[in-house]
Amino acid sequence: MIKVEKLSKSFGKHEVLKNISTTIAEGEVVAVIGPSGSGKSTFLRCLNLLEKPNGGTITIKDTEITKPKTNTLKVRENIGMVFQHFHLFPHKTVLENIMYAPVNVKKESKQAAQEKAEDLLRKVGLFEKRNDYPNRLSGGQKQRVAIARALAMNPDIMLFDEPTSALDPEMVKEVLQVMKELVETGMTMVIVTHEMGFAKEVADRVLFMDQGMIVEDGNPKEFFMSPKSKRAQDFLEKIL
């Protein structure tokens, strides 16, 4: 599904990703964890070309998306992205937020887009909020709308960039529940997260990153019970 080979990314002279290579299978759920500044979010943003790599290749479903003339908008149609700070349109209702990309990018009819949006809102438990504007929603509700909006494009892959880190603690659970339900559908998911219990419970694999490199790549149970690297041991001791 996703093949990353020797991926590198720099901002000025600062090398953020250093020759990263990994493969993610279809239907696999991969949690990306590590200390702040380790390159986790940059790695995720490279997967849908929100950041353009300086070197290496990314291949998704046999298509190398890092080729110079790649249509980035086409790539993003098939990859849903959920951000830390929601990125909802403040001047559009919940329903309009979810319908926007299917109507304007995929050219779906408004009726079809609305039916799909309403169905997704039922799934994330927010159908009754469909005509509200984002400023009327809690942080957890905004993030659930953001997940529904990403799913409205029928993506093959979902990327989550610390989806709960901007939320009050009591709102984290409702967002994680929606994500758990998505895992059960067999969606391919890459999740940058600080929620270690969630990573342990739902991930098929854990990538531990530090200083722009993947230091460990393995089974969540083994990683959390007995990390191999000193850096991972130190990290887990501080947060668990």
Swiss-Prot record:
The keyword Manganese does not apply. It comes from the Bacteria. Disulfide bonds: none annotated. Disruption phenotype: Impaired growth on arginine as the nitrogen source. ATP binds at residues 34-41. Residues 2-236 form the ABC transporter domain. One of its GO terms (molecular function) is ATP binding. Belongs to the ABC transporter superfamily. This is Arginine transport ATP-binding protein ArtM. It comes from Bacillus subtilis (strain 168). The lineage of its organism: Bacteria, Bacillati, Bacillota, Bacilli, Bacillales.
